[in-house]
Amino acid sequence: MKKPNPIIKYFLTLAILASGFASAYSQDLHFSQFFEAPLLRNPALAGIFTGDYRIQGVYRDQWNSFTNAYRTGSFNGEYKLPVGRTDDYLTIGLQILYDKAGSAGLTSTQVFPALNYSKSLSNRRSSYLSLGFMGGYVEKRIDISKVTTNSQFDGAAFNPSLGNGETFPSPDIHYWDASVGMSYNGTFGTVQQNSLFFGLAYHHLNRPMNSFYQNTAVELQPKWVVSGGARFNVDERSEFTVQADYSYQGTAREVIGGVMYGYKLGEFTDDPKYVLGIGAFMRIGDAFIPVIKLDMLPLSMAISYDVNISTLSTVSQGQGGFELSISYKGFLDRENSAKNKMLCPRF
C-alpha cells in the first residue's frame, strides 16, 4: 500500500489539530465510557448507585498516531446523606476534569461541586425522582509560543521562525459554569435487581464567555443531554446493561449507546461480589467501542478502545481513543446507612 506524502500528511495533521483547537471552544469533552462519569452526563445522576459513597476516575488517551495526543482525566466523588426520618436522601459530590489537547498545549481544568436531592416516590423505597445542580470554576490555557498558523508558510515550506500573526490579550481565560438536571430511577418487574433510569440535563445554563480574545460575543453554547439506561437479569448468573446518551450543543449532535453483558461469578448470585462484563458501544458516525469490565466489589475496572470509523480514519490510521476507568464504592458502618435505608439502584 502506498504511504501518504509526508507533506500532505503534515498539513492534514495540522488541519485536524486546528479543528480540535476550534472544537475546544464550542463543544464539550466526552468519554466513550460515559457511564463511568455520571456527573458529566447529568448532576441528577449523582448518588444513583449501590452504596453510601463512590469514587470514580476515567483516563482517556486519544489519537496517539499524532505527535500530540489528546489526554483527558476525570475524577468524581459522591457521598449520600439521609434526610431526616424520610426515605429521601441528599448526595453531595465533586467533579474534577482535566484535559490537554493538540500541539498548542490547550489545557482545560474544571472543578465543580454538585448537589442532588432524591425524593422517594414509593413506600417500598424502590423509585426516586432527583433534582441536581452542579457549578464551579473553569480555567483554560494555551502556550502561545506553540500556536502555528498559515502565516508561517513561506511559499515553499512551513517556517517556524516566522511569526504566527496572532495576538492574544492573555494566554488563559477563567469563568464560572453551571448545570442543572432531573432524573428518575427505580426497579421494575419481579426481580429487585432489575432497574432503570431516565434523565435530562441542561449544561452551561449561564452561557459563559469562551474566548482567548476576550470577545464577549463568543459564548459557550448550552448543551442538552438526554440519558437512559436499564439493567435486567436474564437468568441466575447473566445480566444485561443498556446505556445511551443523546446530546446537542449549538450545531453539534452526538448519539452514543450500547450494551454490556455481565456474568456473575462466585456463590452468591443475588448480590455477587465478582462480575465479568463485555460489551460494545457506538458513537454514531465516529467510533465503534468494545469494552471489558471487571467488578471485584467494592472495586470496578473497565478498559475500552475507540475504533475510528469516521472520515478521519485514514489520517488517524484507524486509531481512536484508549480509556481506563476505576470505581470504588461501599457502605459506611452507620445506623442510617443506605444499606438499611433504601433499595439502591444497581447503576
Predicted regions and their residues:
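Bacterial N-terminal signal peptides
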Residues: F11-G20
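Sec/Tat signal peptide C-region and signal peptidase I cleavage site
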Residues: F21-S26
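Subset of outer-membrane beta-barrel
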Residues: Q27-F347
